[in-house]
């Protein structure tokens, strides 16, 4: 990956222009380049700064679809989880999940055990092709009451009989996984530019003649031409097409504001836990009475979620009000009374929009969106070279993007081959065993950083870690980590020079581990100083960049409009945006 080059968007007519640099757009760009297409990818903010960045970090294997008797989705989800464990083993790994059982109707071992048995039988091929044993998904098992209380002593003991344990996938860093797809596409010749917003489709003769793109860093505009335009802008996709869709209503539908938050609690083990929430799934055929809330170890913190709310406002306005956050905390405390969470325990929150089912704005028991929306606008609006993909599940992004690129290829050249992303490892994934890679990194950084920092470097960059460490030899950057962190000083420079980081927030939230769970402390000032040197900021700009990052950690009365990411523009303003 090289430095940002907005001018390259005006260099030629591309085969496909992908709008949206989240997981769906990144997967589509990677897929199209592997099929030999020339690709441009534009993102209005930073790559993976919206919905994709703020997910719950799970790569789901489809067990939830048992209660819907939707075996097709179950099998597809399991297959995609397996592929991510193979194609990006440094960024995805198994996580054990505990589901407590009780001597109550629909919450006992018999029903849950039957479900686990069926799931294991339906997914016997889940580890096919996964070379690293540490990345394989084990069979489910049961533990007794004493053992589950040993793991989670704050569980309510009344009627508790034990627990089931199943394994799912967890992303180490969702933003870096998206970046791995973007970087892989660029290695194959794609042009990718962040802070480049698609403002308007320029139509003529029942086709998109060009797309007007604005550079948020300079205010410049360019008209990008492509044979096919793939709109993968997530919840912003309908707004881009609002004028086109005004009379058709093809893109209308409800969106869920999915929310989760990070708290100052640290489990002494790697197990997540699924607790009974207060809402039900009206589409479930077989149900354990309520939807699950998850508490998951997340670095040195705990991630809690997910809560859903029908959202009808603009995606730029996504927010969580303080009273909502208090209700979320109360619900967790009710499910696990001994936990005793308070508002002061919350270090960060994430929220964003995903397509939902048909729901009224005041509904509490909500219907999930079941499948991504893939729209051929030749049929929907008579625009022959426009395709829209609005994704639902991060896990399914690769497969859904492949379907979208199939449609793109049919419009360009039906003889183009099938997708290869199901078997092509991402950049940095060229290793057999992650523990061996981490050991190699530890040896390389011996004397300047500990094992935790070495492991983090291996997770974030895979075999590309050497390109990061090489920058530490420059005296003005220096070796070792930022104060009190596992982030190497060289990672800041690498983010700017090789990964298009344009703002301090890009570095802190999406390129490094500095703020994956909470405020990075003194390391933030050091990172700002390094970024200022790399990007040529004056003191006023450095302070402004710091202020934007600091606002991300406001919890409480001022949190109502504190969106997870902002787009700093030339006038010094900040446009709110979010995602989950």
Language model regions located:
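Core beta-strand elements of the Rossmann-like FAD/NAD(P) dinucleotide-binding domain
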Residues: 12-14, 218-228
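Glycine-rich FAD pyrophosphate-binding loop
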Residues: 33-53
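Flavin (primarily FAD) binding-site architecture
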Residues: 231-246
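Dinucleotide-binding Rossmann-like beta1-alpha1 core, especially the glycine-rich loop
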Residues: 57-151, 290-293
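Extreme N-terminal leader/targeting segments of oxidoreductases
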Residues: 1-16, 31-35
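A conserved short coil-to-beta-strand element within the FAD-binding core of flavoproteins
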Residues: 194-209
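Helix-loop-beta segment of a Rossmann-like dinucleotide-binding subdomain
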Residues: 129-134, 139, 149-188, 210-212, ...
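C-terminal catalytic lobe of FAD-dependent flavoproteins
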Residues: 174-176, 184, 245-305, 309-523, ...
